[in-house]
């Protein structure tokens, strides 16, 4: 009973989100729920066993900073849901993005990134990484010629988000992947806003997928975490641009990660070196909470999307709204085409609209909402609101804000799973209060 042993059977997403990584009850206790292994370290059977673990000859646990059995289940499950070969959970989404870039680029290297990304990611690429000799060219990701022209000899990756932040623009993952692969570099995709339930970027050519697990994966605004998923198809050796992955690594017994770890080389190197040395480790309890979140991911996302599309329709017809930025109502035919291709079941419960008026009017509207929580998070089951220009993207210059589609009167909504009538009533009363 309760054993997923048939290798000839391919399970669907809703089943995988419940079972992968714990195909049978805990072998020691028979517990059906994944146990929380709250431990810092692990006992080795003997000296040779310890040496084999440290030499990566035995894949078991070494130390809590690197691995944990609860974390392992979470990693296997999210890898399966994204269609990847391996995953690494870390302490935050920011850590996941930082480790991914640092695993690809070193001093003197270059990244090509979309302009329309999360403000924290923009600051990392624009201000922090240049201190370590890694530069970034930001491009209009919808102009494929501009993307390709930005790639240099020292470019190590193209970085995008499935849905741009904060306006939920749909990016053509497949087209960008083709450009990246033409130049023998990987495509990195932040899939936080879409989730693998709506879009699996690896199926469209992405090589590495990152998430802020804090958002839809956790789903309840309780826990900080991030995850990196490896697609397993990029040929690091044929590329010739990533010696730290392909050549003997002096920091780890002269190991070649591609030869030793195959399709898990990318995340294994992060775990063995970057995580070992800098320690942005996820806690066992956080991993457990994210597993709880994954078990209801499809159910929650369905409701998020259902509610969001009704709110988009309401706002799109409201006299006090200048424009709604959501792919379902985007006037650009190309966005409509991409939305149908990548989101056949709908999507985008995090989006923006421009209220008629200025920054003060936008903030006045926000302050009159009661059901919506004003906070710096998204993808909670509770509906959320924020004024990007003065909060999440406040470090950007006016020019950078406009480049990212953010105006003084832009308001970002994250639509929750409350009753849709209550959500719309709250918006309606806030509009009436500022007339």
Where are these regions (language model features)?
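Short hydrophobic/aromatic beta-strand micro-patches
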Residues: 229, 352-354, 414-416
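Conserved small-domain helix->loop->beta segment predominantly found in fold-type I
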Residues: 278-281, 285-287, 292, 296, ...
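Conserved N-terminal alpha-helix of the aminotransferase class I/II PLP-enzyme fold
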Residues: 46-95, 120-127
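Conserved PLP-enzyme active-site core in the AAT-like
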Residues: 4-9, 21-25, 86-318
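PLP-dependent enzyme catalytic core of the Aspartate aminotransferase-like
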Residues: 1-3, 126-127, 135, 153, ...
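Well-ordered beta-strand positions enriched in small/hydrophobic/aromatic, beta-favoring residues
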Residues: 158, 226-228, 324, 351, ...
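N-terminal glycine-rich, Lys/His-bearing helix-loop that initiates the first secondary-structure elements
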Residues: 1-58
